[in-house]
Structure formats: structure tokens, C-alpha cells
UniProtKB/Swiss-Prot annotation:
This is Large ribosomal subunit protein bL12. GO terms for molecular function: mRNA binding; structural constituent of ribosome. GO terms for biological process: translation. InterPro entries: Ribosomal_bL12, Ribosomal_bL12_C, Ribosomal_bL12_C/ClpS-like, Ribosomal_bL12_oligo, Ribosomal_bL12_oligo_N_sf. Belongs to the bacterial ribosomal protein bL12 family.
Amino acid sequence: MAKLTKETFIASLKEMNIQEVMELVQAMKDEFGIDPSAVAVAAGPAAEVSEEKTSFNVILKSDGGAKIAVIKAIKEALGLSIMDAKKMVESTPVAIKENLKADEAEELRKSIAASGAEVVVE
């Protein structure tokens, strides 16, 4: 008997209908003693690809019409000069502070948003 190549097997499989494929699978289970539930258990749960975000950026989207109050809030929160805070507010959207922990980012967002600014944490 000639050796069956992978390509020949796949080509033959493509020509089969669903019933024939199911019969082939059952025959393989019987011949090789494969238990499908054992294969699923051996594979285990799929590894989670998503990582939990640990670094956050606080972004000033707009001054919300309260430019002076927002400038003061940024000056106090970041320890900037009044001119640096003004430049930051005038160049929205701008990252106020980057690479913060979640609680620090939320605290900063709340303190600046209290002045009327539109601030988001990303």
C-alpha cells in the first residue's frame, strides 16, 4: 500500500460530505481509542490574551468654559507656573500626566474636573 501524504488526505477530505466526515471521525475514534473529552481537558482553557492595564494617562479634553478655574486647578495639581498651566489648557486635548496608577489617575481627574474641565483617564 502506498503511503498517504498529508496533501492527498486533505484533498480527499475536502471531497467528502458531512456524513462521510462524521463516519471518518468515528472510525478514527474507534481505531485509535481517542476520547474527545480527554483532548479538550488536556488542552485546558484558552489562555487570556488581554492584559490588565496598569498605567493610565489623564487627558484634558477641554476647559469646559471655565478656563481660569481650570488653569488654577492644573497649576495646583501639578505644581506648574501659571504660564505653563495656561499653555497646557490652551493646547487641549493634552495629556496632563502620564503613566499613573489607576487610583492616582482618578484622583487627579476628579480634582481637575471639579473646576469645570472635561477630563478623561485613558
